[in-house]
């Protein structure tokens, strides 16, 4: 189901949902600064609040996430700044609607798709970066411990690797061969299980999808957890992929409300076009998730959840 917005001309790529004091916030990718929406209910009208970042000389803000720590709000987001392409930054605000400022660059390389989480063992940042030293080169999912919200340990662990043709990013990104993409990690724990959801493939392709990995453990040091990708035998096993009413389904976040899990993700309506030029049509959607004993299934409907 599409989310309902009071401002209908915009797209909402890479949506991250966040709840604070009974209000829901949605943060999305945008060129001039991370854009935000606000709503009192998941399926009611979302009000456009504009750009909430206050970075200097930066653009192409991608895939933000937000965490609240001791009455401060921290946003982790990649952007283009100082001729550095999509390096991960952190910024702080006193309100969920910003302005997020006092930014700091966290890594000196391409690093995208954050999800900062806190366990009893500390802060851990899930994100994606490139690995060129493998048979299947491309973007992988990593986790790094943080000393404080601004300071990574800078010793990330590679967690998920590509395995399937459906995880290729096309058109090819290298002259040498195929490029594989795992990105958009989102971690949560339910019962005895830890879940690591992710996006795979190219957002313009039919095979772009959301999958997940699992670990049955109470381990709080997330760098010590060994996640196993959920597969259908030797084939990929998407939780969310294109269906009869939407395509381009990917990059998501998860929220638990009234003991029910929901995924908020972007997708596109089907559209007949003869042009090869990409037009941004990704909009935020929502579906209910069933999460039970290491298994996630999605319940998707076109006009309700």
Residue map of PLM features:
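Carbohydrate-active catalytic/glycan-binding domains of CAZyme proteins
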Residues: 1-305
